[in-house]
Amino acid sequence: MAAQNEQRPERIKTTPYLEGDVLSSDSGPLLSVFALQEIMQKVRQVQADYMTATREVDFTVPDVQKILDDIKALTVEQVYKIVKVPSISFRHIVMQSRDRVLRVDTYYEEMSQVGDVITEDEPEKFYSTIIKKVRFIRGKGSFILHDIPTRDHRGMEAAEPEVLGVEFKNVPPVLTAEHRAMIQSALDGSIIENGNVATRDVDVFIGACSEPIYRIYNRLQGYIEAVQLQELRNSIGWLERLGQRKRITYSQEVLTDFRRQDTIWVLALQLPVNPQVVWDVPRSSIANLIMNIATCLPTGEYIAPNPRISSITLTQRITTTGPFAILTGSTPTAQQLNDVRKIYLALMFPGQIILDLKIDPGERMDPAVRMVAGVVGHLLFTAGGRFTNLTQNMARQLDIALNDYLLYMYNTRVQVNYGPTGEPLDFQIGRNQYDCNVFRADFATGTGYNGWATIDVEYRDPAPYVHAQRYIRYCGIDSRELINPTTYGIGMTYHCYNEMLRMLVAAGKDSEAAYFRSMLPFHMVRFARINQIINEDLHSVFSLPDDMFNALLPDLVAGAHQNADPVVLDVSWISLWFAFNRSFEPTHRNEMLEIAPLIESVYASELSVMKVDIRHLSLMQRRFPDVLIQARPSHFWKAVLNDSPEAVKAVMNLSHSHNFINIRDMMRWVLLPSLQPSLKLALEEEAWAAANDFEDLMLTDQVYMHRDMLPEPRLDDIERFRQEGFYYTNMLEAPPEIDRVVQYTYEIARLQADMGQFRAALRRIMDDDDWVRSDGVLRTVRVKFFDARPPDDILQGLPFSYDTNEKGGLSYATIKYATETTIFYLIYNVEFSNTPDSLVLINPTYTMTKVFINKRIVERVRVGQILAVLNRRFVAYKGKMRIMDITQSLKMGTKLAAPTV
């Protein structure tokens, strides 16, 4: 029984290399991993040499499937939360007074604890702290009120106290009955009104909320109240067009009843995606290519043609000496099959992936392999006209191989008249003197290869993605035609194939001509399938834009390097024969196909958020240069990357390009205007608008040094002292008089430190009861409360650090202005047993640091003012209403099987 209950290990699915006529089954993500490995082999050759002299880089190939799963998880992530009560914006600290309390704005109290301490020499930490504070604002204010707790008061609906955003439960126990009745009367007046927002019934009430948080809440509420009906219609209409292009029916399942009166819906993402957002990312061409393969390429099998074709044409005789007959019965190895995959990847991504010949001494010594590859290579690949599958070197090598094959007289001799140039194929052959020069590669016209006298790139009806309007037509085949493999291709032909048959007959290669004539239907089905895959499945935001596609071939010929250079993959000679004898037959559509538009939208949205963050951080560097003395643009690039979702970083860095992005790449990307609209982007921009006031981030440059005695009042009347609610703070109500303030810049401080007079100068200013301000430096501010004497490091702490040391007979001084500053509140508590001098010390206690922030963080208020902060309008959705995120409806529905598959 134990043996039966023992779980069997899960079988790992592997890709078979040879099962009858079917060679292998490759899915999109699997092919993307393979393509990424091969592409990275080429990319690393340059990168590794460059990095040898600098630093080590992790070149491990990332898991593409895991990255896709992580991005899918981002599509269901909500940037808002649905709550019953808003967060507490104001709390109260009870003192010994019966009619006075301290009201604390909890936003500033919590914000002061967010992030690290800012210093002058760590700009990356400064940027990271700013981003954390901005994200705190966005997260704190991104809430939707739903089903708030209410109570009945004399037939009217009133809000429960916890809904108002003010925490005061600790106040009533210390109040008199008269004051408690006054507060209760104010609470009874918090009536909830019925409202109507976008034809939906809602509750409207007045509550309390801090200004930065309310800005985010208001932006979110405005986003919802705007309904976005037109955006939804545009998205659905675009999905219908995309579904028609990709043979996918759009599902209305999620949208069945979203228009009902009891439903509030939120559309967090929009379609179509702005392709400029994706393609503006620096050094992103390889990453976008891999994402295109992973999200769109179908699962398929490599199918061999009918074996009778070769048996009745090439191997019909007992003795076979021709190169084709020799290779007919060969079986590919695993490495050769990998080369076949590369060939089909190059055919599916013309121009983006091009092929070159692998240096293999063994195959170069085998003339039969080279000659066969020279013939089939001219029928498999396109070299010029509008795009190319080959490098110039490979095209020339194929020309030389075809030249050798035509001159290989193994059956009968034919007449050959050589031309004057000595170039490959510069001769006329046969009785009719066929001019073989036409098969020599010409990248300007495409002669000699599949693009010869063929319209292989077409622009017709507008495509869903505006940046990729082209339609690829290998061999002149229209991808709109339906394919029946049993009959398709019969009677079809194209110019290059016809000319190849004519040339083979002229050269006396009748058996080979018969073989190619019989292979023509199989060959046409092959390229018809490839055309359909390119024009339907692979059409994506990750498709290469038309302007870049059109520039690939001219740049390749001219040797110019642009943003989207083609990737060169090496293949062996014999793999061309195996690729010609096998066709990629799609069996299943890619499982990511219907969710791909949503993945593209969330990726573009995250990129837009990153771009907005970097723009504001770069602006910040110009606003406060003194706190960012050693800052470089690369610092805010790294800070934004560190706080971005891991999945988005992984996609951007699929080819490890982040190690090679320079300042020019980054600043060019940041200054480009393209953005992808989304709810997250709208809230991020609003959060940055709130963060423009640095005091809302609990950062300030108005920190003063001033000697002040800690109050030590006499307790002559303890009852009166308690009723006043006595407290002390180093927070200033207003800046000091300007004529009593000495502005201390870095230059002044350094000069006096060099003269050894820094402390003496400050002492003289303090003795004159003046103030010292350190100019232009932002400082991190913390807020703390004490009911006993604060520690000495807070009381006597200075708003700068000054260290001196001696080394080698020289004195060194270090001055830092950017230090942590603490705003403290000391609440005095006394008992009736205290004597009049209980708070008096023989030696006074001094405080040295004063802070001015133009915000009401803490204030002493009377009991009647506790609810005076209820001045914000809130909209809450009724409990019987449904709040529905319809972002998931932006997925296409059921994939239709391709006809005749």
Curated annotation (Swiss-Prot):
One example GO MF annotation: structural molecule activity
Keywords for the protein's UniProt record, in alphabetical order: Virion
Short name of any one Pfam family annotated for the protein: Orbi_VP3
A single Gene Ontology CC term: virion component
InterPro entries: Inner_layer_core_VP3_Orbivir, Inner_layer_core_VP3_Reovir
Source domain of life: Viruses
Compartments, as annotated in UniProt: Virion
Homology family: Belongs to the orbivirus VP3 family.
Function: The VP3 protein is one of the five proteins (with VP1, VP4, VP6 and VP7) which form the inner capsid of the virus.
Protein name in UniProt: Core protein VP3
Lineage: Viruses, Riboviria, Orthornavirae, Duplornaviricota, Resentoviricetes
